[in-house]
Amino acid sequence: MAANYSSTSTRREHVKVKTSSQPGFLERLSETSGGMFVGLMAFLLSFYLIFTNEGRALKTATSLAEGLSLVVSPDSIHSVAPENEGRLVHIIGALRTSKLLSDPNYGVHLPAVKLRRHVEMYQWVETEESREYTEDGQVKKETRYSYNTEWRSEIINSKNFDREIGHKNPSAMAVESFMATAPFVQIGRFFLSSGLIDKVDNFKSLSLSKLEDPHVDIIRRGDFFYHSENPKYPEVGDLRVSFSYAGLSGDDPDLGPAHVVTVIARQRGDQLVPFSTKSGDTLLLLHHGDFSAEEVFHRELRSNSMKTWGLRAAGWMAMFMGLNLMTRILYTLVDWFPVFRDLVNIGLKAFAFCVATSLTLLTVAAGWLFYRPLWALLIAGLALVPILVARTRVPAKKLE
């Protein structure tokens, strides 16, 4: 098991309290006006996000359907078939590189597509917690600043701390993170293009148990190299280095068998390059493992569906928040009356929910209109339901 040492230093903290007068009606109205502008921007941005997402989703789905109808699987990956020149091919095989990747500073050498060195520094980290409360007619903001030491991969600028004295971090690391990538990667006789090499991202931690300490001032503990006098009790500024790799090339007695991938791309000589579809999209697919062509396209369609629904939800949320901010001024006008204020708040949120849902569905329908007119009309009909429900509830409330 890898050792993961940490400091036993005492947590430090201090509290600051800022006092300000309670904002008047005009001041709060001015703040709300600024929020209205932000809300308007979010509202308009949501239309762009939802509409373009539908175009992207349908374009991707069309390209995948086209690719599935055209893809062919060569008889062998150890020979280049001339009859497949320019065609979309389905290749399965183990990755192979031309040379070892290494970091001579730490004595690390292995056959892989990518080798990543990850460097962390022991630093002071500031966290703050704030709360506001009213006391004697004044608004008070209490902020609690806490300082603790942690291993972080990014430089934390202690000059931005509320209290830098006693919590100063170094301004740079003596050793930096980096990633080495094999220039040539093959599957059988075929060379992967740079776009496919970028997709090899199945990083695994590299065990350092069989490596020796590379230098006198570097200590190996578990799967880390420590630039520290005592890794068990590190000091601010100490470093620790770990390694990970992706795309193991060739069988290794310690790391296991070579990594197998499934690629769908265009054959250009002995290279696998992007394939352009009739819809204007490109197909350049790499999946980790052994999959049939049908399985690869099914996985891509599922991924496209999840991305589409995720962006739809993000667009709806942006629209809902935008409407909330734009109607916030109505809440400000009545916030002197507690009971009425709460009723208005509930009503405004219900209004924003209904309008955001309706406009989202209408925007989705508009995005589909050019591709699937019948589906667009159905969604447009569903979009009117929340509005009709809201309108029918208004007379009922008036009768009450």
Curated annotation (Swiss-Prot):
InterPro entries: TMEM43_fam. Highest expression in placenta. Also found at lower levels in heart, ovary, spleen, small intestine, thymus, prostate and testis. Residues 53-313, 367-368 are perinuclear space. It is found in: Endoplasmic reticulum membrane; Nucleus inner membrane; Cell membrane. It comes from the Eukaryota. The modification N-acetylalanine is found at residue 2. Residues 2-31, 335-345, 390-400 are nuclear. It is a multi-pass membrane protein. The keyword Endoplasmic reticulum applies. The chain crosses the membrane at residues 32-52, 314-334, 346-366, 369-389. Keywords: Acetylation, Cardiomyopathy, Cell membrane, Deafness, Disease variant, Emery-Dreifuss muscular dystrophy, Endoplasmic reticulum, Immunity, Innate immunity, Membrane, Neuropathy, Non-syndromic deafness, Nucleus, Transmembrane, Transmembrane helix. GO terms for molecular function: identical protein binding. It holds the Pfam family TMEM43. GO terms for biological process: innate immune response; lipid metabolic process; nuclear membrane organization. GO terms for cellular component: endoplasmic reticulum lumen; endoplasmic reticulum membrane; Golgi apparatus; nuclear inner membrane; plasma membrane. It is linked to Arrhythmogenic right ventricular dysplasia, familial, 5: A congenital heart disease characterized by infiltration of adipose and fibrous tissue into the right ventricle and loss of myocardial cells, resulting in ventricular and supraventricular arrhythmias. Belongs to the TMEM43 family. Can form oligomers through the transmembrane domains. Interacts with EMD; the interaction retains EMD at the inner nuclear membrane. Interacts with LMNA and LMNB2. Interacts with SUN2. Interacts with RNF26; this interaction is important to modulate innate immune signaling through the cGAS-STING pathway. Interacts with CARD10. Interacts with gap junctions proteins GJB2/Cx26 and GJB4/Cx30. May have an important role in maintaining nuclear envelope structure by organizing protein complexes at the inner nuclear membrane. Required for retaining emerin at the inner nuclear membrane. Plays a role in the modulation of innate immune signaling through the cGAS-STING pathway by interacting with RNF26. In addition, functions as a critical signaling component in mediating NF-kappa-B activation by acting downstream of EGFR and upstream of CARD10. This is Transmembrane protein 43. It comes from Homo sapiens.
